[in-house]
C-alpha cells in the first residue's frame, strides 16, 4: 500500500506552479542540480509513517502573472525510481500487488487550472495519471522565492502538498488499516527560466 502511495505522490509532486513572475515565462524543473523533489508519506499500520521519494522525473511549467489561467505545468515520473530506503519493500511496492511498474512505468501530471489566493499562494488543479487511472486533483502551492542565481540563470521555487486516496487509482488497500488508504504527497521544485 505504501508503494502505491509513493507513485501517487510522485505524480502529484509535479503539480507545483510558479505563483509570481513579471511576465509569462517557461521554466524547466531543475532535477540535475537536485533542487526538486517528489516525496510521499504514508501510515505504517497506523503506528508510524513511511517516507519515500521518486528519484527520476522531469517537467516544465509556464507562468503568467497577468493571466494565471494561462499558467501550466507538466510532469512525468518514472515509477520504478521509487525509493523508501528499504529495497525489499520497494520491490513489493513496484510489483503487481501495488504500483505494477512493469505495466505502468510512468505517472504523469498535467495541469488544467490555477486559482490565485494572494500572497504567493494558490491552488493548482490538474489530472494525475497513476497505475493506469486518471483523476482530477487539487494541490495548494506556495511560491518560496525567485530571482537570479550566481550563474546568470533566473529561478523560481515552489512547494505544495495534497492527499491522495489510493483506491481512486485502482490500488486495492482493503487488506490494510484505513490509515494506510491515503498518502500525503509533498513536492518542492526549483525551475530555471528558459
Predicted regions and their residues:
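Low-complexity, acidic/polar, glycine-enriched regions of mature
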Residues: 22-194
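Gram-negative bacterial Sec-dependent N-terminal signal peptides
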Residues: 1-23
Amino acid at each position: 500500500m505504501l508503494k502505491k502511495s509513493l507513485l501517487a505522490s510522485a505524480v502529484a509532486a509535479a503539480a507545483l506552479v510558479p505563483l509570481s513572475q513579471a511576465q509569462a515565462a517557461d521554466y524547466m524543473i531543475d532535477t540535475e542540480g537536485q533542487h526538486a523533489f517528489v516525496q510521499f508519506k504514508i501510515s505504517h499500520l497506523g503506528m508510524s509513517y513511511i517516507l519515500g521519494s521518486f528519484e527520476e522525473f522531469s517537467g516544465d511549467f509556464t507562468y503568467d502573472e497577468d493571466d494565471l489561467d494561462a499558467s501550466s505545468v507538466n510532469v512525468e515520473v518514472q515509477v520504478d525510481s521509487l525509493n523508501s530506503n528499504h529495497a525489499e519493500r520497494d520491490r513489493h511496492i513496484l510489483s503487481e500487488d501495488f504500483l505494477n511498474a512493469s505495466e505502468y512505468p510512468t505517472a504523469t501530471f498535467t495541469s488544467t487550472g490555477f486559482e490565485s489566493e494572494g500572497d504567493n499562494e494558490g491552488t493548482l488543479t490538474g489530472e494525475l495519471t497513476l497505475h493506469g487511472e486518471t483523476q482530477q486533483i487539487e494541490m495548494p502551492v506556495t511560491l518560496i522565492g525567485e530571482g537570479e542565481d550566481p550563474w546568470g540563470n533566473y529561478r523560481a521555487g515552489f512547494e505544495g502538498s495534497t492527499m491522495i486516496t489510493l483506491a481512486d487509482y485502482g490500488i486495492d488497500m482493503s487488506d490494510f488499516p484505513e490509515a494506510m488508504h491515503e498518502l500525503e504527497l509533498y513536492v518542492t521544485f526549483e525551475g530555471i527560466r528558459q
